[in-house]
Amino acid sequence: MCGFSRRFDKSYRDAYNKMQAGAIGSPSVLRSQTCDKLDPSGFFVAYAEFSGGIFVDCSIHDIDLTLWFFGASSKVKSVSAVGITAVEPDLRKHKDRDNAVGLVEFYDGRIAYFYASRMMAAGQEDTTEIIGTKGKVTVNTQPAMNHVNLFDDTGVRREIPQTYYDRFEYAFVTEANEFTASVLDGTPLPLDLTAAVQAVRIGAALQESMVSGKKICFDEQGNRTEVARL
């Protein structure tokens, strides 16, 4: 089983169930982001040597959400991406960026837009919008650690999760429990590895497009018809 933690998050599961029930009509556009808090220690530069890049490390979760909400059989028509190094120029040594935007077009006419960042000031900001023909459903568009608001002489404010693990703590617990149940009780695994492999392929193509500056196209069998090179 591949640990895409957001599939085990209570809010994302609720959003998925609402979409499946027809609450937003036909899902047509997905806009999602994975944005980490700035770490001035240089950790992300060292990590980039092994991570596969910001799309493979961060946006992979948004890509997996897309395949979940749009359906694992969705066929990619093209990917394109751009990125900048706003705070960590040394990331370019590893062909990586600290802010990046990616666009994925599917053969069925749907599109997905991804934003990834390593420089959030307040904390972890992972949000998603699924826009349909009759409405939209959003997840975490106003991040909050809990239900506490602080009122003082500066105004009203609330804290938000500081790390990815703070945000998805209970999703990791649910994931471990469901995997254990699959092993011990024979319950079905909650996700298909074929979709996980497809998510990695899309992430790698976005990373390549970002570095090369070229759009990458695919035929309906998944073969590349226009090749960008790092």
What are these regions (language model features)?
Residues 202-212:
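Short arginine-rich
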